[in-house]
Amino acid sequence: MKFKIFSVIAGLALLFSACDEVLDRPSPTVAEDESYWVSAEKVRLYSNSFYLHYFEGYGTGWTHSSAPLLDYTFNDDVVNYSTQAQFTRAVPTSTGWGGNYKWIRRANIMVDRIDSRMKDILSVEEYSHWMGIARLYRGLEFARLVNTYGDVPYYDHVVKTSDLEDLYKDRTPRNEVMDNVYDDFEYALANIRLNDGAQNINRYVAAALVSRWALYEGSWQKYYYNNPSQATKFFNLAVAAGDIVMNSGRFDITLDFRSLFGSKDLSSSKDVILYRKYDAAQGVTHCVASYSNVSESRSVGPNLSLIKSFVCVDGKDWQTSSVENSKDFSLANLIKTRDSRFEASFYHKPTVKSKSCYLYPVKFIPRSALKYLEVKGGAPDVEYTSVNNLNGYPVLRYAEVLLNWIEAKAELSTLGAGSVTQADIDLSVNKIRNRPLAQEAVERGVQKTAPMELAALPDDPSRDSDVPALLWEIRRERRMEFAFEHSRIIDLRRWKKLEYMDTDANADLLSGTWVNFPAECPDDLVDGNKGKIRVMTASGDLITFDGKNGAKMVGFFYPAENKGRLPFLNVPNINPYLTPVGSNTITDYSNKGYKLTQTEGWPESSN
């Protein structure tokens, strides 16, 4: 499935809303609204205005706010060639949730207008479908809000500017909000069409999204709020949503990993539930592949923690694997001994173009685009430079649904609400591990990873004692599958595992790939790099290049510029799991005689 750019209606929803610093308030009079809701096609046009909000893909041109590689760089997978990005350390002045409420207002307008003005215009089937779409949008936006702020003011109706009690009400408890989201999601799954055309949201798209957000909420309830009954409710919803997609027979794992992200046309791929297509003729291009072309210098790249997380081809972690040379971290060996997603995600040679780690991500560019590197003096094709990129992005993948589904089932088994069978593992993790390999990968020695066996799970010595082995390995699968995509920081928060980002506790967060400089990068051992190249040996010793010790420059690349982040755990007045509301927003409420409670764990102001 694909969707296009609906430039004609890009500003459509603005006809029905206006903004201020607290919530989006409606315009006092909007003539367009009175005459708009007259047909199903008008509803479709209004619905289409949500697409780029929820399905940005690679972004457009230089513009991107939630694009892979470029925007998901705050987690334990990446290292910056500088001080690492910090967690919020004080209540900000002006940031808040106004942008979310803009979309909630738009969704509530859609719900209201369909119900109050279109019952005699739409058929019963049309009414149910479009109401399902509207409630899906509302549920998604509140799920996003709650994931960020915890308790939030809940609205299931269009707020009137004259109703100050409503406009300035305090937060609604998270469980009450999410119970309403649960109802919206259930309605959407029961009423959205199974098929509404190749460019439109259908029930399978809705189910994929519900599987994601229900899993997230179940985890929050289990690990952060210690509420097993609420956790069970949402884990069950995640499983049910996954079942809808999996039982349809429409989806499968058929493409090699790299082709998922480098192909221009994914319309016939069973791996993809929804994707964004790019078209130069329409002026719709992106820049993400340009930052994957091994010519563009990158200051953010994969760290050693991510590298070590990749499972060996026998299905075991690197410390317990029986694969020959499993403890050899040279890139050539990692490609042969690790899961195929490693080779598909990274350039096969260490390079200074990835300044923080010498390992360059190439996950989001087709293999053919890097053929220029085989030619002396070659340069990337114009299509893979600047904002000329045309490869499409799979905004919803079948693999994600499978991993959401199996994780939810595994979580339910820990809550006494079901069990996981080998058949479940085969339908999910093992189906993904059995995806086809690109011929170029095979020629480099890449192999498929052995199936996961429930009766013989790895005993990873790095596993947290409070995480069962099955969940540990499922979480590993997510990390390999979704590197540089949307989910890692969300995963750490919902598992209550932000300690994984503590650079004081884990040097692997600040170091990169293994580099044998004399053999692999001899041209970098020049006087101009004195004091700039530093490696960490396998035993943890640091060696800095001094112009004479080039032969010793073998180890994990660890430049002195890679600095750790400040403490963020168990610090008074800091809650790294939830985001504070800006003090100006709280002051605005107070000035009007109302109270807005600050986010849990944060003071009312930055003073």
Regions found by a protein language model. Name each.
Residues 146-147, 153, 196, 216-225, ...:
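Short coil/turn linking the two alpha-helices of tandem helical-hairpin repeats
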Residues 5-14:
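Sec-dependent N-terminal signal peptides
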Residues 16-18:
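C-terminal motif of bacterial Sec signal peptides marking the signal peptidase cleavage site
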Residues 100-103, 180, 262-312, 433, ...:
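Long, intrinsically disordered, low-complexity segments
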Residues 20-80, 152, 178, 186-187, ...:
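An aromatic- and glycine-enriched ligand-binding surface/loop that stacks and positions planar moieties
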Residues 328-398, 601-607:
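Flexible, polar/acidic helix-loop-strand segments at domain edges
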Residues 41-56, 77-149, 165-198, 330-336, ...:
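Conserved, well-structured interaction surfaces
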